Amino acid sequence: MKLILAIIRIAKMNETKIALSDVGLPSFTVMSVLGRGKGHGDLEKAPFVDPEHLELISEMPRLKSKRMITLVVADDKKDLAVETIIKTNQTSRSGDGKIIVIDTIHSIRVRTGEMGDITLD
């Protein structure tokens, strides 16, 4: 089993939700998160930024609102999940997101006590 964490743009959430469901991965959790990557974005194109303050603003660590999708999949569905998230979210611009894949030892369905891959359906 794999735990997949995907941090994506808010604007891509609905498209990602539909794409994951369309490939048979309808079960996931979504959280609102704040974060930043190494890039500062393209502040020079922002109409509200005073040129006098551009240098100061670009050096400040600003947090951006994103969505974090968490899903647990069987090992044989990891590539499908990752490829679907990439295909849906890749724009080749800074801020497209990040995907982290983590080995998972156990999954337990609380309602029934079932364990293992059967809990992923």
Ranges and model annotations:
Residues 1-121:
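Positively charged, small/polar-rich N-terminal and surface patches that mediate targeting and assembly
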